[in-house]
Design a protein with these regions (language model features):
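Acidic/glycine-enriched connector segments
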Residues: 2-6, 10-119
Length: 119
């Protein structure tokens, strides 16, 4: 049986982090969450997964490039079977994460919220 690995990424300034928590809480038991170590969406995803006892793959922040992409961004998607990206509609970094997920043909859903929708 193939493990389900969900890459979760997004903007540091994403305005409604409850979206991230609710998504993680909806995942089936045993799902592996892959996320970076940045503030915002990454932190919310790791926190929610840890609170549920889901395994977490953490992609450390490194300044290396892999195939023209930041190594950290590529690492978030390594082994992912699907991705959920939470975007404020402005972050160029998150826009790049969307492109990486598409490049690796990972089924991806992008959730966009206007920064004016703050919690």
């Amino acid at each position: 049986m193939t493990e389900t690995v969900v890459a979760i990424a997004g903007s540091r300034m994403y305005p409604k982090l409850d979206d991230v928590t609710n998504f993680v809480n909806s995942l089936p038991e045993g799902t592996i969450v892959s996320a970076g170590l940045a503030a915002g969406v990454d932190k919310a995803a790791r926190k929610a997964a840890n609170e549920r006892g889901l395994p977490v793959n953490e992609a450390p922040m490194v300044a290396l490039m892999v195939g023209g992409e930041p190594a950290h961004d590529v690492a978030v998607f390594k082994g992912a079977t699907q991705a959920r990206i939470f975007w404020d509609g402005k972050s160029q970094g998150t826009k790049g994460m969307i492109a990486i997920a598409q490049k690796f043909d990972i089924p991806t859903k992008v959730v966009t919220r206007d920064p004016e929708d703050a919690e």
